[in-house]
Swiss-Prot record:
The keyword Cell membrane applies. It is found in: Cell inner membrane. It comes from the Bacteria. This is ATP synthase subunit a. F-type ATPases have 2 components, CF(1) - the catalytic core - and CF(0) - the membrane proton channel. CF(1) has five subunits: alpha(3), beta(3), gamma(1), delta(1), epsilon(1). CF(0) has three main subunits: a(1), b(2) and c(9-12). The alpha and beta chains form an alternating ring which encloses part of the gamma chain. CF(1) is attached to CF(0) by a central stalk formed by the gamma and epsilon chains, while a peripheral stalk is formed by the delta and b chains. The keyword Transmembrane applies. Pfam families: ATP-synt_A. The chain crosses the membrane at residues 29-49, 89-109, 134-154, 177-197, 208-228, 235-255. InterPro entries: ATP_syn_F0_a_bact/chloroplast, ATP_synth_F0_asu, ATP_synth_F0_asu_AS, F0_ATP_A_sf. HAMAP family: ATP_synth_a_bact. The gene is atpB. GO terms for molecular function: proton-transporting ATP synthase activity, rotational mechanism. Key component of the proton channel; it plays a direct role in the translocation of protons across the membrane. GO terms for cellular component: plasma membrane; proton-transporting ATP synthase complex.
Length: 264
């Protein structure tokens, strides 16, 4: 594959594909491509599942209906096995997280030059198509989960119960309150950070490998042939990675919210 636009050095090619289409500066920088693809894929998910739901029949289902029902049953069984409280929000939330994250991850399957080349032809200099390789996207989702953890912890346990959980565990003695508070606060904050960084790190590394393989197509015939083999092998392996990362994000969300519902 060739770099879009004018000829780039290997370093420039990599940097070009890892640069977001942005507006603004500093803290107020907006990554337009990440927002476009994440919101667009979210809307596609809602439209697709709503359409299947409206057309669902009790007779012989079509292939798409079977596929959607299989996903829903898989997520529902995962929630029932992991979540020990009662909350009608958890299963729809888990379904949304799993499918949405998978769809964003799946954009990594698109050859690295296709969409950036179309964007360059339209006069758009940068176009990064995998939203989950953007820390802003992964952290925004993780922070959303974090806020739900705080909300349900206070709702189920009350403010006093939540404060007690932070100050009287794991050592149930007033003299250990500072130590308990430090340990529990670090544990609480580590949850969204680990969610965000795990998803970002795996997908960013996967995208970088695809870019490095794409560089081989611009070399000699031997490297180009090797690139085809490597790309096919990595493509097959990466399907497992993107699915696993969506599943892990969903399962950790369920586990964290289940812990928030446990009244000690």
């Amino acid at each position: 594959m060739a770099a879009t636009g004018e000829a780039l050095t290997p370093q420039g090619y990599i940097q070009h594909h890892l640069t977001n289409l942005s507006v603004g500066e500093g803290f107020w920088t907006w990554h337009i491509d990440s927002l476009l693809f994440s919101v667009g894929l979210g809307v596609l998910f809602l439209w697709l599942f709503r359409s299947v739901g409206k057309k669902a029949t009790t007779g012989v289902p079509g292939k798409l209906q079977c596929f959607v029902e299989m996903i829903i049953e898989f997520v529902d069984s995962s929630v029932k096995e992991t979540f020990h409280g009662r909350n009608p929000v958890i299963a729809p939330l888990a379904l949304t997280i799993f499918v949405w994250v998978f769809m964003m991850n799946f954009m990594d399957m698109v050859p690295v030059d296709w969409i950036p080349s179309l964007a360059a032809a339209a006069g758009i200099p940068y176009m990064k198509v995998v939203p989950t390789t953007d820390l802003n996207i992964t952290f925004s989702m993780a922070i959303g989960v974090f806020l739900l953890i705080i909300y349900y912890s206070i709702k189920v346990k009350g403010i006093s119960g939540f404060v007690k959980e932070l100050t009287m565990q794991p050592f149930n003695h007033w003299a250990m309150i500072p130590v308990n508070f430090l340990l529990e606060t670090v544990t609480l904050i580590a949850k969204p950070i680990s969610l965000a960084l795990r998803l970002f790190g795996n997908l960013y590394a996967g995208e970088l490998i695809f870019i490095l393989i794409a560089l081989m197509y611009g070399a000699n015939m031997a490297l180009s042939a090797l690139g085809v083999t490597l790309q096919l092998g990595w493509l097959i392996f990466h399907i497992l990675v993107i699915t696993l990362q969506a599943f892990i994000f969903m399962m950790l969300t369920i586990v964290y919210l289940s812990m928030a519902h446990e009244d000690h």
